[in-house]
């Protein structure tokens, strides 16, 4: 495959090295399987890059503005699918790289989903539970119709958990006019068992590392 990157793109620095590494791996793999040029070009960049800035009321009465991301890489095989991470080092380029990897993982295992990834640049350990509730709900509200059970389905990742997925689900259903049907509950995976989650989800990633 020829040059997938813009001629004006700056050389990778430490913060973008991961993304450039994944793009380079895609280019090498595309050559090996003789992937058509236009397919490689499409896969080298995400379909959508969503960046939101949203205010959150803190316990001391002040407001802080947080930056959140949702990268939707490719949905040819099915809805975008991938985790949400709350971490101080969450960056756009990191989310882009991880979303690409999700696309490839789903395709390799013949799972009918595409690749997505996102998160909020924050330290979740620095907040009270009440602040985390407000942050998660405000982020969900800011994403709005950019997620949904037939379009983009988030899941837990670094710094997030099953309880937060329930907060996302509840907020999403409220945004949708109060529709609390089973279909709307599928907006996220990794929920608590009491709210429709799956048995074994909390240790699935670790088991995958051990057995695969």
Predicted feature descriptions by range:
Residues 4-204, 210-212:
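N-terminal ligand-binding/catalytic initiation module
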């Amino acid at each position: 495959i020829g040059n997938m990157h813009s001629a004006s793109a700056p050389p990778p620095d430490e913060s973008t090295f991961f993304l450039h590494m994944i793009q380079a791996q895609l280019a090498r793999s595309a050559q090996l399987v003789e992937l058509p040029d236009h397919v490689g070009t499409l896969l080298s960049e995400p379909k959508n890059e969503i960046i939101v800035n949203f205010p959150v009321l803190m316990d001391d009465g002040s407001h802080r503005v947080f930056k959140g991301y949702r990268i939707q890489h490719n949905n040819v095989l099915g809805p975008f699918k991938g985790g949400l991470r709350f971490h101080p080092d969450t960056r756009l380029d990191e989310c882009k790289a991880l979303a690409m990897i999700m696309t490839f993982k789903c395709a390799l295992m013949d799972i009918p989903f595409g690749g997505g990834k996102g998160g909020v640049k924050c330290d979740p350990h620095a907040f009270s539970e009440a602040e985390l509730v407000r942050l998660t709900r405000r982020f969900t509200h800011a994403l709005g119709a950019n997620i949904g059970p037939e379009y983009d389905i988030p899941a837990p990742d670094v710094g997030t958990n099953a309880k937060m997925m329930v907060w996302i689900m509840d907020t999403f259903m409220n945004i949708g006019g109060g529709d609390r049907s089973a279909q709307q509950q599928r907006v996220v995976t990794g929920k608590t068992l009491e709210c429709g989650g799956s048995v074994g989800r909390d240790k699935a990633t670790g088991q995958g590392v051990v057995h695969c």
